Amino acid sequence: MSEKQSPKTSEAECSAMDLPEFEDEENWLFKVLGFQPGPSSALDDDTDDQADEPLSAAEFLHLQDILQEDRVSSTDDEDTCQAGCTEDDETSHSDRDIDNNVKVITGNIKASPSMYMEMFTDQNPQADQDLEETESDGAMNPTD
């Protein structure tokens, strides 16, 4: 029951079968870009020479049009994002907390919790002072 299975096609046959499919994709790409494909040997062997050849005016303009279309579509997306929020919206929703003292602490709280507690208690006197000022102004405290 243990028969050795031989592959139905060899590796050389598989690579030969893939080649026409690759050439079709290559021709499609040239067709989309508007180029005339050269012989396959020119594509494979003379890549340095092709890079030195200048584009014709028609090829250059066609590529420039394609790039311009991409820029226009990406610019439209940015305009759509910007249109949702105007300058009036930004100012009406601001906190007006310009003078708030905010500190960002990064690190591992599990490694040295005492350091974080010290920083927290250092900030509390300022918060207590702000609370006293609010109460002395007669403002309502929403937490009461």
Swiss-Prot record:
One GO BP annotation of this record: male gonad development
Domain of life: Eukaryota
Region (Disordered): 1-21, 69-99, 120-144
Tissues with expression: Testis.
Pfam families: TSX
GO cellular component: cytoplasm; male germ cell nucleus; nucleus
Biased composition (Acidic residues): 75-90
Its job: May have an RNA/DNA binding role.
The name this protein goes by in its record: Testis-specific protein TSX
Organism name: Mus musculus (Mouse)
Lineage: Eukaryota, Metazoa, Chordata, Craniata, Vertebrata
